[in-house]
Design a protein with these regions (language model features):
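Active-site residues of response regulator receiver
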Residues: 50, 96-106
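Alpha4 helix (beta4-alpha4-beta5 surface) of REC/receiver domains from two-component response regulators
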Residues: 107-111, 115, 134-157, 161
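Structural beta-sheet core signal
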Residues: 48, 129-131
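Conserved beta-strand scaffold positions in the cores of enzyme catalytic domains, especially
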Residues: 73-75, 155-156
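Glycine/Thr-rich phosphate-binding loops of Rossmann-like dinucleotide-binding domains
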Residues: 103-104, 139, 166
Length: 191
């Protein structure tokens, strides 16, 4: 049996992770031993936006857990990076951090997370989105949740703080995949 592997894709060079393909496995690169081009994706293309608020983030661990399943994680640290991913790659599920800056030059001035949600909602086929709250006041949390749900968010979750929070994120992604893609991988056979 052949196995297909993919790699985590990042639009930030200093966050790029390259994983060597397994020996004897089909890498999806036409038998040349090279990984498939990232724009082709795998069974599922996952946009991971992350505002960089934790030293050992779940966003580093999640792609390693999903990669053996054929999930390609596209990581973005700003709204501009997320926009570049969306315009170049079909996204099947998006994780949107509401604290995401628009760009590196103004991390505090404008937050790109809400704008990214609006951009995703305007897509011809909007992907289901999982929204990560900014952890502000209760009133602001309520406002963020309502705005996210109005824009079609599948789920709104608290900021993951520890590795145990990965289980919640994995369960939310599993439910999202089951509900929106009816038990089928968007880019391949059923799961």
């Amino acid at each position: 049996a052949l196995c297909r592997t993919t790699r985590m894709v990042s639009v930030r060079p200093h966050h790029r992770h390259h994983h060597a393909p397994p020996l004897g496995g089909d890498t999806g690169g036409g038998g040349s031993g090279n990984p498939a081009p990232s724009h082709l994706g795998g069974r599922l293309n996952l946009l991971l936006s992350y505002a960089g608020w934790h030293a050992d983030p779940w966003v580093d661990h999640l792609p390693r857990l999903l990669e053996p399943l054929g999930v390609v994680s596209h990581r973005a640290g700003t709204g501009r990076e997320a926009n570049a991913v969306i315009t170049s790659t079909p996204i099947h599920i998006a994780v949107v951090d509401l604290g995401l800056p628009i760009d590196d030059s103004s991390p505090q001035a404008e937050e790109g997370g809400p704008r990214l949600l609006e951009l995703l909602a305007r897509q011809a086929s909007p992907p289901p989105t999982v929204v990560i709250k900014r952890s502000r006041s209760h009133r602001d949390d309520i406002r963020d949740i309502n705005a996210a749900l109005r824009l079609g968010a599948f789920a709104v979750v608290d900021r993951p703080r520890k590795i145990d929070d990965l289980n919640l994120m994995l369960e939310v992604l599993r439910r999202c995949l089951a509900r929106h893609y009816h038990g089928m991988w968007p880019g391949g056979p059923s799961f």
